[in-house]
Regions:
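A short beta-sheet element
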Residues: 141-143, 147, 151-201
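Short, solvent-exposed loop/turn positions at domain surfaces
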Residues: 136-139, 170, 216
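Non-catalytic DNA-recognition/assembly elements of restriction-modification systems
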Residues: 5-105, 237-278
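Sequence-specific dsDNA recognition surfaces
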Residues: 90-105, 118-150
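Short coil/turn segments at secondary-structure boundaries
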Residues: 52-56, 105-113, 211-213
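A short glycine-rich beta-alpha junction/loop motif
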Residues: 1-7, 174-182, 214-238
Length: 278
């Protein structure tokens, strides 16, 4: 390998360290930007962010909230309710279909459709970074969904890591994927799927859902009953749109910061190569 002078070696080190420090700074700022989304949601929806954790020794519940639900303590322990002091609040099941019935009947079995396994969803931004392809013939045994549906992971650790995304640009408007997804769809045009998606990505919602896990160690899941029982505020449609636009803008800014940081480091590496080899 070429050995430049001590002065040139120090210059190389300085260039790299400076770029690495700047990249780290921008990535950290992006991380803080993403984390601030949770506080923004609670503030704009007038939800109490200082909810006390329920006492572990006992619970007092209205009989109306228990009927039809599980009776085990984990179902009610450490719940974080998105109850607004300003807007009307509803159980998730009253505003969204959860695992709606979906049939591919009427399609030719060789019709190409999208295939989305768990690993295709980015947990940081909640987006699908790769869409694979399959056919209706090969979709048997998988979770089925349609254009615009929300996929929300039910199993640990995918759920608490944020494996959720809205499916878009599906082949022929339909797809299939992991059986460990819940599929959600708005019940009417008064609720934005993007709005529900953002609420269900809130850190406290995911943390509370983790407390409700059932199943054996290593394969614990959130039950559909728990998901249906989550309370969410529903402001006017125009307010939902404003909230979604604001948060998507915050996410875009975070992405841009990360890209800038990565670009600075890559440019520094190229500069170093020129110094050493040219």
């Amino acid at each position: 390998i070429p050995i430049p002078s001590m002065k040139e070696q120090q210059k190389v080190v300085d260039i790299y360290i400076q770029a690495q420090v700047e990249r780290t700074r921008r990535h950290q700022t992006a991380k803080q930007q993403l984390e601030s989304i949770d506080d923004y949601l609670l503030d704009v929806l007038h939800v109490d962010k200082n909810q006390a954790t329920l006492c572990s020794n006992g619970y007092v519940k209205n009989i109306s909230t228990i009927l039809g639900n599980r009776l085990d303590v984990s179902f009610y322990r450490n719940r974080f309710e998105l109850i607004s002091k300003k807007y009307s609040n509803f159980p998730l099941s009253s505003v969204a279909h959860i695992d709606p019935s979906i049939s591919f009947r009427g399609y030719d079995v060789n019709t190409p459709i999208s295939f989305i396994p768990m690993e295709c969803i980015d947990e940081i931004y909640g987006e699908i970074h790769v869409i694979k392809s399959t056919t209706i013939l090969q979709s048997k045994g998988y979770t089925k969904f349609e254009e615009g549906d929300l996929l929300w992971a039910k199993i640990t650790p995918c759920m608490q890591n944020g494996k959720s995304a809205i499916v878009k640009n599906l082949e022929n408007g339909i797809g299939c994927g992991s059986t460990e997804f819940f599929v959600l769809r708005p019940r009417n045009n008064n609720v934005l799927m993007d709005y529900i998606y953002l609420l269900l990505r809130h850190h406290e919602v995911l943390k509370a859902a983790q407390s409700s896990f059932g199943g054996s160690a290593g394969e614990q899941r959130v039950s559909s009953q728990y998901l249906k029982s989550i309370i969410i505020p529903i402001p006017d449609y125009s307010i939902q749109k404003d909230i979604v636009a604001k948060i998507y803008n915050m996410k875009s800014q975070a992405k841009q910061l990360q890209k800038e940081g990565d670009k600075l480091l890559e440019e520094a590496k190229q500069k170093i190569e020129k110094l050493i080899f040219e």
